[in-house]
């Protein structure tokens, strides 16, 4: 599907401009043309990009392959940029990104994507309701698109942070394989976000600071605002990754500590039965030279069997081997550390939200 929005230099607005009129629109230096290719066949897109718009062959090849991380290329009379939108599944904590290819010229904006992208749909509705946005030029439309696309990343980071908050109690009190699965899901999502928002930050940095012929210097401040948001997102995501790694370390430590407690209990039980087994085996021997027929021998053997575990229990307690205070202390320390890191993350997130509102 191909959508077009054209505002001529005289102010006349045309939707779904026929392809045969695109060249005329491109020659209107005071007009603005936006063409959106959504799930369009490659055989239909390539001739339009090559012949009608005259884009560079390498940029067209990159567009049609759809396998790139965010980047930006300057081809003098137009810019080619690759950015990614985000799709977040709150149940599985899975992050999916869709590539959006953008061409920006002095009087046109071209977008190409295989899947529907919410930011593009929003911009289409927005300019339909307020057509004055076209008066500010295609570079301002690009700013609006990137701003909405970037804002969609914050709910995903908030949801991942909430998932880690829910794990705080579980990871200490009753860690399960499901807990480990959630930790790895958050870790995978944070890693995926890092691979996208890091390069995307550099794209916005170039748009905000470099001199491009197709961007009005007065509009660079808008791209700088989006760049600031991405910087905050990168910082929050790095903190989220650190919290996830810390939660994983704590989970493994708690699990190891529980295994150690179980092994200690089993070892103590085995230690109790070792002298008892020795006594029973000794007095169960069939040597006639030993006074096994003595009437007081039963009382001696029974007393030894009862007293030996009691003496061992007293000795173990004196040595501190049966105390769990060290385990409780370790849990308190690790819990405090995790809560401190989480509070710092929430503080950074609130600052980011407040900065975005400003």
List where the protein language model places each region.
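Hydrophobic alpha-helical transmembrane segments and their immediately adjacent juxtamembrane loops
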Residues: 228-358
């Amino acid at each position: 599907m191909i959508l077009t929005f054209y505002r001529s230099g005289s102010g006349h607005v045309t939707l779904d401009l026929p392809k045969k009129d695109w060249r005329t629109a491109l020659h209107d230096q005071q007009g603005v043309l936006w063409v959106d290719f959504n799930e369009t066949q490659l055989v239909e897109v390539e001739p339009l990009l090559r012949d009608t718009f005259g884009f560079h062959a390498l940029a067209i090849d990159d567009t049609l392959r759809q396998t790139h991380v965010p980047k930006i290329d300057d081809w003098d009379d137009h810019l080619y940029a690759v950015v990614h939108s985000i799709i977040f599944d709150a149940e599985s904590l899975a992050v999916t990104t869709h590539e959006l290819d953008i061409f920006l010229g002095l009087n046109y904006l071209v977008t190409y994507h295989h899947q529907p992208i919410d930011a593009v749909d929003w911009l289409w509705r927005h300019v339909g309701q307020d057509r004055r946005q076209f008066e500010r030029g295609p570079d301002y439309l690009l700013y609006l698109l990137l701003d909405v696309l970037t804002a969609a990343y914050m709910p995903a980071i908030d949801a991942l942070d909430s998932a880690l908050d829910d794990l705080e109690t579980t990871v200490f009190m009753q860690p399960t394989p499901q807990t480990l699965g959630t930790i790895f899901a958050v870790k995978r999502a944070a890693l995926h976000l890092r691979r996208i928002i890091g390069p995307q930050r550099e794209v916005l940095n170039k748009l905000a600071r470099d001199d491009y012929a197709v961007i009005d210097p007065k509009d660079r401040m808008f791209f700088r605002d989006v760049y600031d948001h991405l910087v905050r997102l990168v910082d929050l995501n790095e903190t989220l990754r650190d919290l996830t790694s810390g939660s994983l370390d704590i989970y493994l430590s708690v699990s190891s500590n529980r295994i150690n407690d179980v092994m200690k209990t089993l070892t103590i039980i085995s230690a109790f039965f070792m002298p008892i087994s020795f006594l029973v085996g000794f007095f169960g021997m069939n040597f006639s030279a030993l006074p096994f027929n003595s009437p007081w021998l039963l009382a001696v053997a029974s007393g030894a069997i009862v007293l030996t575990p009691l003496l061992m229990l007293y000795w173990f307690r004196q040595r501190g081997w049966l105390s769990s205070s060290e385990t409780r202390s370790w849990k308190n320390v690790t819990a405090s550390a995790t809560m401190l890191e989480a509070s710092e993350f929430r503080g950074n997130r609130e600052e980011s939200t407040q900065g975005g509102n400003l």
